[in-house]
């Protein structure tokens, strides 16, 4: 089994950070409550240098914020797009981006739900148990408009489902009870200062 998949394809070797991050700039991460996170994003219809530059910025922002995935509306851009650099439960690394992603519906009889911890860069510092299927299949396009299919299991399946939720206008708090949502927001308030200090240090390290 290859140790790295890039854009859903096995790759012999890959650097610690996606090359896109070296070209990108850090953008502000939007937070829960901001309108752009709570409405469905627009389809990407223009493929070109502006889209490529956005992907570069998203990779750099994701690494600085210590995320496994990042959707465009998490940097304030109302487009159906996300990037990811995420391991699965077997330790295989998955890196890439998806434009106009659509999550396949799984046969309920064949799927297994995993009720495990999940966080979000737009709810800084909070982690709550969220049930998600242990497998995900997402179809979309790459930055050049070429069709892509990406499959994930375990933690990577959770990442794919989480990021597809984002472009559909949902955050993981929407999957929690009212009491759990309040607990997550309290966690975020308590840990916010620590999270933002780490992000600032990471941004400085990337710029060095």
Curated annotation (Swiss-Prot):
Its cofactor is Fe(2+). Coiled coil: none annotated. One of its GO terms (biological process) is translation. The keyword Transcription regulation does not apply. Its EC number is 3.5.1.88. The keyword Iron applies. Fe cation binds at residues 120, 162, 166. It catalyses: N-terminal N-formyl-L-methionyl-[peptide] + H2O = N-terminal L-methionyl-[peptide] + formate. It comes from the Bacteria. GO terms for molecular function: metal ion binding; peptide deformylase activity. SUPFAM superfamilies: Peptide deformylase. It is an enzyme of class 3 (hydrolase). The active site is at residue 163. Pfam families: Pep_deformylase. Binds 1 Fe(2+) ion. Keywords: Hydrolase, Iron, Metal-binding, Protein biosynthesis. PANTHER family: PEPTIDE DEFORMYLASE, PEPTIDE DEFORMYLASE, MITOCHONDRIAL. HAMAP family: Pep_deformylase (MF_00163). Belongs to the polypeptide deformylase family. Removes the formyl group from the N-terminal Met of newly synthesized proteins. Requires at least a dipeptide for an efficient rate of reaction. N-terminal L-methionine is a prerequisite for activity but the enzyme has broad specificity at other positions. This is Peptide deformylase 3. The lineage of its organism: Bacteria, Bacillati, Actinomycetota, Actinomycetes, Kitasatosporales.
């Amino acid at each position: 089994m290859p140790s790295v998949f890039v854009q859903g394809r096995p790759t012999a070797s890959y650097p610690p950070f996606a090359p896109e991050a070296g070209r990108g700039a850090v953008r502000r991460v939007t937070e829960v409550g901001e309108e752009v996170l709570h409405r469905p994003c627009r389809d990407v219809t223009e493929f070109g240098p502006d889209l490529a530059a956005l992907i570069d910025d998203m990779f750099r922002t994701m690494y600085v914020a210590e995320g496994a995935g990042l959707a465009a509306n998490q940097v304030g851009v109302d487009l159906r797009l996300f990037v990811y650099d995420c391991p699965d439960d077997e330790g295989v690394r998955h890196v890439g981006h998806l434009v106009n992603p659509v999550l396949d519906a799984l046969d309920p009889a064949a799927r297994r739900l995993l009720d495990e911890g999940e966080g979000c860069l737009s709810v800084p510092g909070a982690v709550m148990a969220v049930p998600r299927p242990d497998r995900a299949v997402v179809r979309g396009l790459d930055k050049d408009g070429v069709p892509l299919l990406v499959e994930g299991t375990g933690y990577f399946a959770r990442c794919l489902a989480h990021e597809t939720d984002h472009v559909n206008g949902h955050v993981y708090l929407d999957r929690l009870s009212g009491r759990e949502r309040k607990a997550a927001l309290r966690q975020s308030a308590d840990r916010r200062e620590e999270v933002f200090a780490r992000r600032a240090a990471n941004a400085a390290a990337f710029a060095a």
